[in-house]
Amino acid sequence: MSPSLVANAEAVAPVKSGMIKEPLKVSGALPPDYFEVTSIIGREYPTLQLSELMNSPRRDEYIRDLAITVSERGVVFFRNQKDLTVAMQKEFIDLLGRLSGKPETSGIHIHPLLEGKRDVGINDAGDVDDHISVVSSKLSRKLHLASRYNFASKGWHSDMTFEHVPSDYAILKMRKVPPTGGDTIWASGYEMYDRLSAPYQRFVEGLTAKHANPDFQAAAARVGFEIYPGPRGAAENVGQDLIANHPVVRTNPVTGWKSIYGALNQIEQLNELAPQESQEVLRYLGQLLTNNHDLQCRFKWGVDDVAIWDNRSSFHTGTPDVDVNHIRTGNRAVSMGEVPYLDPMSTSRREALGEAE
Protein backbone atom coordinates (compact mmCIF):
# COMPACT_ATOMS: atom_id res chain seq x y z
CA MET A 1 0.00 0.00 0.00
CA SER A 2 1.22 3.50 -0.78
CA PRO A 3 2.84 5.31 2.19
CA SER A 4 0.42 8.22 1.74
CA LEU A 5 -2.53 5.88 2.05
CA VAL A 6 -1.17 4.42 5.27
CA ALA A 7 -0.51 7.90 6.65
CA ASN A 8 -4.07 8.99 5.98
CA ALA A 9 -5.43 5.88 7.63
CA GLU A 10 -3.25 6.16 10.72
CA ALA A 11 -4.36 9.76 11.28
CA VAL A 12 -7.78 8.49 12.39
CA ALA A 13 -8.18 6.41 15.55
CA PRO A 14 -9.64 2.91 15.04
CA VAL A 15 -12.95 2.04 16.69
CA LYS A 16 -14.62 -1.16 17.88
CA SER A 17 -15.16 -2.85 14.50
CA GLY A 18 -11.47 -2.56 13.69
CA MET A 19 -12.28 0.01 11.02
CA ILE A 20 -10.94 3.56 11.06
CA LYS A 21 -14.47 4.92 11.39
CA GLU A 22 -17.52 2.93 12.47
CA PRO A 23 -20.08 2.72 9.61
CA LEU A 24 -23.46 4.27 10.38
CA LYS A 25 -26.86 2.57 10.18
CA VAL A 26 -30.24 4.19 9.57
CA SER A 27 -32.71 4.33 12.44
CA GLY A 28 -35.76 3.98 10.20
CA ALA A 29 -37.00 7.51 10.91
CA LEU A 30 -37.63 8.50 7.29
CA PRO A 31 -41.04 7.76 5.74
CA PRO A 32 -41.32 4.66 3.50
CA ASP A 33 -42.76 6.55 0.52
CA TYR A 34 -39.86 6.14 -1.91
CA PHE A 35 -38.65 4.04 -4.82
CA GLU A 36 -35.21 2.95 -5.98
CA VAL A 37 -34.35 4.51 -9.34
CA THR A 38 -32.16 1.52 -10.24
CA SER A 39 -30.98 -1.49 -8.28
CA ILE A 40 -27.51 0.03 -7.90
CA ILE A 41 -27.87 3.79 -7.60
CA GLY A 42 -30.53 6.39 -6.90
CA ARG A 43 -33.62 6.76 -4.73
CA GLU A 44 -36.55 9.14 -5.12
CA TYR A 45 -38.90 10.45 -2.42
CA PRO A 46 -41.79 11.77 -4.54
CA THR A 47 -43.67 13.57 -1.74
CA LEU A 48 -41.19 14.24 1.08
CA GLN A 49 -40.55 17.95 1.77
CA LEU A 50 -37.06 18.83 3.01
CA SER A 51 -38.37 22.05 4.57
CA GLU A 52 -40.60 19.96 6.83
CA LEU A 53 -37.60 17.91 7.96
CA MET A 54 -35.74 21.11 8.77
CA ASN A 55 -38.62 22.43 10.87
CA SER A 56 -39.32 19.14 12.66
CA PRO A 57 -38.42 18.56 16.34
CA ARG A 58 -36.82 15.33 15.04
CA ARG A 59 -34.72 17.28 12.53
CA ASP A 60 -31.34 15.82 13.46
CA GLU A 61 -32.66 12.25 13.45
CA TYR A 62 -34.21 12.69 10.01
CA ILE A 63 -31.17 14.38 8.49
CA ARG A 64 -28.76 11.81 9.91
CA ASP A 65 -30.82 9.01 8.36
CA LEU A 66 -30.96 10.90 5.08
CA ALA A 67 -27.17 11.32 5.07
CA ILE A 68 -26.73 7.58 5.48
CA THR A 69 -29.29 6.92 2.75
CA VAL A 70 -27.53 9.28 0.34
CA SER A 71 -24.20 7.59 1.07
CA GLU A 72 -25.70 4.14 0.48
CA ARG A 73 -27.69 5.01 -2.65
CA GLY A 74 -25.25 7.54 -4.14
CA VAL A 75 -27.91 10.13 -4.99
CA VAL A 76 -31.42 10.87 -3.69
CA PHE A 77 -34.08 12.95 -5.49
CA PHE A 78 -36.95 15.10 -4.21
CA ARG A 79 -39.69 16.74 -6.27
CA ASN A 80 -41.21 20.23 -6.03
CA GLN A 81 -39.24 21.62 -3.07
CA LYS A 82 -40.50 25.19 -3.50
CA ASP A 83 -40.37 25.93 0.26
CA LEU A 84 -36.67 25.09 0.54
CA THR A 85 -34.96 28.49 0.69
CA VAL A 86 -31.32 29.19 -0.17
CA ALA A 87 -30.53 29.67 3.53
CA MET A 88 -32.18 26.35 4.37
CA GLN A 89 -30.34 24.66 1.51
CA LYS A 90 -26.97 25.73 2.94
CA GLU A 91 -27.88 24.77 6.49
CA PHE A 92 -29.27 21.44 5.33
CA ILE A 93 -26.17 20.33 3.43
CA ASP A 94 -23.87 21.38 6.27
CA LEU A 95 -25.98 19.43 8.76
CA LEU A 96 -25.93 16.41 6.48
CA GLY A 97 -22.15 16.27 6.85
CA ARG A 98 -22.00 17.20 10.52
CA LEU A 99 -24.61 14.67 11.64
CA SER A 100 -22.78 11.90 9.77
CA GLY A 101 -19.38 12.69 11.27
CA LYS A 102 -17.47 15.21 9.16
CA PRO A 103 -14.71 17.18 10.95
CA GLU A 104 -15.74 20.29 12.87
CA THR A 105 -13.30 22.28 10.75
CA SER A 106 -15.14 21.49 7.50
CA GLY A 107 -17.90 23.78 6.29
CA ILE A 108 -19.44 24.85 2.98
CA HIS A 109 -17.25 25.28 -0.07
CA ILE A 110 -16.47 28.60 -1.72
CA HIS A 111 -15.88 28.08 -5.44
CA PRO A 112 -12.43 29.09 -6.79
CA LEU A 113 -14.24 31.19 -9.41
CA LEU A 114 -16.02 33.39 -6.87
CA GLU A 115 -19.78 33.40 -7.37
CA GLY A 116 -20.00 37.12 -6.61
CA LYS A 117 -17.94 37.95 -9.70
CA ARG A 118 -20.16 36.10 -12.15
CA ASP A 119 -23.05 37.52 -14.11
CA VAL A 120 -25.72 35.13 -12.78
CA GLY A 121 -27.48 35.35 -9.42
CA ILE A 122 -29.12 32.96 -7.01
CA ASN A 123 -32.53 34.53 -7.77
CA ASP A 124 -34.25 36.74 -10.32
CA ALA A 125 -33.09 39.83 -8.42
CA GLY A 126 -29.49 38.93 -9.21
CA ASP A 127 -28.35 38.46 -5.60
CA VAL A 128 -25.09 36.55 -5.13
CA ASP A 129 -23.77 34.24 -2.42
CA ASP A 130 -20.21 32.90 -2.47
CA HIS A 131 -21.39 29.71 -0.73
CA ILE A 132 -23.87 28.95 -3.53
CA SER A 133 -22.70 27.87 -6.97
CA VAL A 134 -25.13 28.85 -9.69
CA VAL A 135 -25.33 26.02 -12.21
CA SER A 136 -26.21 27.75 -15.46
CA SER A 137 -26.22 26.57 -19.06
CA LYS A 138 -25.57 30.17 -20.10
CA LEU A 139 -22.59 30.54 -17.76
CA SER A 140 -21.20 27.16 -18.80
CA ARG A 141 -21.11 28.24 -22.41
CA LYS A 142 -19.33 31.46 -21.41
CA LEU A 143 -16.72 30.01 -19.05
CA HIS A 144 -15.96 26.64 -20.55
CA LEU A 145 -16.78 27.08 -24.23
CA ALA A 146 -18.94 23.96 -24.27
CA SER A 147 -18.66 22.49 -27.74
CA ARG A 148 -20.70 19.96 -29.65
CA TYR A 149 -17.39 18.64 -30.99
CA ASN A 150 -16.34 17.32 -27.55
CA PHE A 151 -17.40 13.95 -26.18
CA ALA A 152 -20.19 14.53 -23.66
CA SER A 153 -18.45 12.00 -21.40
CA LYS A 154 -15.75 14.62 -20.77
CA GLY A 155 -18.10 16.11 -18.18
CA TRP A 156 -18.06 13.19 -15.71
CA HIS A 157 -16.71 14.26 -12.32
CA SER A 158 -17.05 14.37 -8.55
CA ASP A 159 -17.15 17.81 -6.99
CA MET A 160 -14.00 19.60 -5.84
CA THR A 161 -11.55 16.68 -5.90
CA PHE A 162 -8.74 19.20 -6.51
CA GLU A 163 -9.11 20.32 -2.88
CA HIS A 164 -7.03 18.70 -0.12
CA VAL A 165 -10.28 18.32 1.84
CA PRO A 166 -12.84 17.60 -0.88
CA SER A 167 -16.62 17.39 -0.75
CA ASP A 168 -18.71 14.85 1.08
CA TYR A 169 -22.25 15.92 0.09
CA ALA A 170 -23.76 18.35 -2.39
CA ILE A 171 -27.30 19.61 -2.96
CA LEU A 172 -28.71 21.12 -6.15
CA LYS A 173 -32.11 22.78 -6.47
CA MET A 174 -33.19 23.57 -10.01
CA ARG A 175 -34.77 27.01 -10.50
CA LYS A 176 -35.37 27.08 -14.24
CA VAL A 177 -35.54 24.19 -16.67
CA PRO A 178 -35.78 24.03 -20.46
CA PRO A 179 -38.76 22.38 -22.18
CA THR A 180 -36.51 19.41 -22.90
CA GLY A 181 -32.91 18.45 -22.23
CA GLY A 182 -30.55 19.26 -19.38
CA ASP A 183 -30.87 15.93 -17.57
CA THR A 184 -28.18 14.94 -15.07
CA ILE A 185 -26.67 11.45 -14.91
CA TRP A 186 -25.08 9.88 -11.83
CA ALA A 187 -22.87 6.79 -11.62
CA SER A 188 -21.80 4.57 -8.73
CA GLY A 189 -18.14 4.55 -7.71
CA TYR A 190 -18.94 1.57 -5.47
CA GLU A 191 -20.07 -0.46 -8.45
CA MET A 192 -17.05 0.59 -10.50
CA TYR A 193 -14.86 -0.93 -7.80
CA ASP A 194 -17.02 -4.07 -7.74
CA ARG A 195 -16.59 -4.49 -11.52
CA LEU A 196 -12.83 -4.99 -11.06
CA SER A 197 -11.28 -8.43 -10.58
CA ALA A 198 -9.73 -9.10 -7.17
CA PRO A 199 -6.12 -8.76 -8.45
CA TYR A 200 -6.96 -5.47 -10.17
CA GLN A 201 -8.70 -4.22 -7.03
CA ARG A 202 -5.55 -4.91 -5.02
CA PHE A 203 -3.46 -3.16 -7.68
CA VAL A 204 -5.44 0.09 -7.75
CA GLU A 205 -5.76 0.13 -3.95
CA GLY A 206 -2.02 0.81 -3.84
CA LEU A 207 -2.24 3.88 -6.08
CA THR A 208 -2.70 7.58 -5.48
CA ALA A 209 -3.74 10.16 -8.06
CA LYS A 210 -2.87 13.77 -8.75
CA HIS A 211 -6.17 15.66 -9.02
CA ALA A 212 -6.32 19.03 -10.73
CA ASN A 213 -8.70 21.34 -12.57
CA PRO A 214 -6.80 23.37 -15.17
CA ASP A 215 -10.14 24.28 -16.78
CA PHE A 216 -10.78 26.70 -13.90
CA GLN A 217 -7.51 28.54 -14.50
CA ALA A 218 -8.23 28.69 -18.22
CA ALA A 219 -11.77 29.94 -17.64
CA ALA A 220 -10.57 32.55 -15.14
CA ALA A 221 -7.97 33.85 -17.58
CA ARG A 222 -10.48 33.91 -20.42
CA VAL A 223 -13.00 36.14 -18.65
CA GLY A 224 -10.67 38.11 -16.36
CA PHE A 225 -11.37 36.34 -13.04
CA GLU A 226 -8.80 35.56 -10.35
CA ILE A 227 -8.75 32.20 -8.60
CA TYR A 228 -9.97 32.69 -5.02
CA PRO A 229 -7.03 31.64 -2.78
CA GLY A 230 -9.21 30.49 0.10
CA PRO A 231 -9.77 29.06 2.53
CA ARG A 232 -12.48 27.26 0.57
CA GLY A 233 -14.64 25.38 3.08
CA ALA A 234 -11.71 23.99 5.09
CA ALA A 235 -8.46 25.47 6.38
CA GLU A 236 -6.45 23.09 4.20
CA ASN A 237 -8.10 24.32 0.99
CA VAL A 238 -5.92 27.30 0.15
CA GLY A 239 -3.79 28.46 -2.76
CA GLN A 240 -4.38 28.91 -6.46
CA ASP A 241 -2.78 25.80 -7.92
CA LEU A 242 -5.91 23.62 -7.33
CA ILE A 243 -3.93 20.38 -7.06
CA ALA A 244 -4.31 17.57 -4.50
CA ASN A 245 -3.27 13.93 -4.19
CA HIS A 246 -5.87 11.33 -3.18
CA PRO A 247 -6.15 7.52 -3.12
CA VAL A 248 -7.60 5.93 -6.25
CA VAL A 249 -9.77 3.76 -4.00
CA ARG A 250 -11.22 5.49 -0.96
CA THR A 251 -13.44 4.31 1.86
CA ASN A 252 -16.72 6.12 2.39
CA PRO A 253 -16.66 6.60 6.18
CA VAL A 254 -20.46 6.59 6.43
CA THR A 255 -20.96 3.17 4.81
CA GLY A 256 -17.53 1.59 5.19
CA TRP A 257 -17.60 0.67 1.47
CA LYS A 258 -14.80 1.06 -1.06
CA SER A 259 -15.24 3.28 -4.10
CA ILE A 260 -13.22 4.38 -7.10
CA TYR A 261 -12.47 8.07 -6.54
CA GLY A 262 -11.84 10.58 -9.30
CA ALA A 263 -12.64 10.33 -12.98
CA LEU A 264 -11.34 11.12 -16.42
CA ASN A 265 -10.13 14.72 -16.76
CA GLN A 266 -10.00 15.26 -12.99
CA ILE A 267 -6.86 13.14 -12.73
CA GLU A 268 -3.58 14.19 -14.33
CA GLN A 269 -1.39 11.29 -13.26
CA LEU A 270 -1.30 8.16 -11.12
CA ASN A 271 1.68 8.96 -8.95
CA GLU A 272 3.21 5.50 -8.60
CA LEU A 273 3.14 4.67 -12.33
CA ALA A 274 5.05 5.73 -15.41
CA PRO A 275 3.09 8.17 -17.62
CA GLN A 276 2.06 5.57 -20.21
CA GLU A 277 1.05 3.09 -17.52
CA SER A 278 -0.97 5.80 -15.83
CA GLN A 279 -2.77 6.63 -19.07
CA GLU A 280 -3.73 2.99 -19.62
CA VAL A 281 -5.11 2.51 -16.10
CA LEU A 282 -7.03 5.79 -16.24
CA ARG A 283 -8.40 4.89 -19.66
CA TYR A 284 -9.77 1.61 -18.31
CA LEU A 285 -11.26 3.20 -15.19
CA GLY A 286 -12.85 5.82 -17.44
CA GLN A 287 -14.37 3.09 -19.58
CA LEU A 288 -15.86 1.47 -16.48
CA LEU A 289 -17.66 4.74 -15.85
CA THR A 290 -18.75 5.68 -19.36
CA ASN A 291 -19.40 2.26 -20.93
CA ASN A 292 -21.61 0.77 -18.22
CA HIS A 293 -25.05 2.35 -18.32
CA ASP A 294 -26.22 -0.22 -15.76
CA LEU A 295 -24.27 1.53 -12.98
CA GLN A 296 -25.81 4.89 -13.88
CA CYS A 297 -29.14 6.62 -13.31
CA ARG A 298 -30.61 9.62 -15.15
CA PHE A 299 -32.78 12.38 -13.67
CA LYS A 300 -35.11 14.66 -15.62
CA TRP A 301 -35.47 17.91 -13.72
CA GLY A 302 -38.60 19.87 -12.95
CA VAL A 303 -38.73 23.34 -11.43
CA ASP A 304 -37.81 23.24 -7.70
CA ASP A 305 -36.65 19.62 -7.87
CA VAL A 306 -33.69 18.73 -5.63
CA ALA A 307 -30.89 16.18 -5.83
CA ILE A 308 -28.50 15.35 -2.99
CA TRP A 309 -25.48 13.16 -3.68
CA ASP A 310 -22.35 11.80 -2.03
CA ASN A 311 -19.25 13.00 -3.89
CA ARG A 312 -17.04 10.40 -2.19
CA SER A 313 -18.60 7.47 -3.99
CA SER A 314 -20.52 8.77 -7.01
CA PHE A 315 -19.89 10.66 -10.21
CA HIS A 316 -22.21 12.91 -12.19
CA THR A 317 -22.44 14.89 -15.39
CA GLY A 318 -24.90 17.31 -16.87
CA THR A 319 -26.23 16.61 -20.34
CA PRO A 320 -25.09 19.49 -22.59
CA ASP A 321 -28.12 19.49 -24.86
CA VAL A 322 -29.91 22.65 -23.67
CA ASP A 323 -30.97 24.75 -26.65
CA VAL A 324 -29.27 28.17 -26.80
CA ASN A 325 -32.72 29.81 -26.76
CA HIS A 326 -33.52 28.24 -23.37
CA ILE A 327 -31.82 28.21 -19.99
CA ARG A 328 -31.19 25.71 -17.22
CA THR A 329 -30.35 27.30 -13.86
CA GLY A 330 -30.00 25.87 -10.37
CA ASN A 331 -28.42 26.63 -6.99
CA ARG A 332 -25.86 24.20 -5.60
CA ALA A 333 -24.31 24.10 -2.13
CA VAL A 334 -21.32 21.84 -1.49
CA SER A 335 -20.33 20.54 1.93
CA MET A 336 -16.69 19.71 2.56
CA GLY A 337 -15.84 16.45 4.30
CA GLU A 338 -12.65 14.73 5.42
CA VAL A 339 -9.23 14.00 3.93
CA PRO A 340 -9.78 10.92 1.71
CA TYR A 341 -8.36 7.64 2.98
CA LEU A 342 -8.50 3.93 2.25
CA ASP A 343 -9.34 1.75 5.23
CA PRO A 344 -7.76 -1.70 4.72
CA MET A 345 -10.60 -3.21 6.77
CA SER A 346 -13.36 -1.76 4.57
CA THR A 347 -15.33 -3.87 2.09
CA SER A 348 -16.99 -3.48 -1.27
CA ARG A 349 -20.68 -2.59 -1.52
CA ARG A 350 -21.61 -5.98 -2.97
CA GLU A 351 -19.66 -7.80 -0.28
CA ALA A 352 -21.36 -5.78 2.45
CA LEU A 353 -24.82 -6.47 0.99
CA GLY A 354 -24.10 -10.17 0.45
CA GLU A 355 -24.17 -9.80 -3.33
CA ALA A 356 -20.54 -10.65 -4.10
CA GLU A 357 -20.08 -13.49 -6.58
Description of each model-found segment:
Residues 2-73, 79-308, 312-357:
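Fe(II)/2-oxoglutarate oxygenase catalytic core
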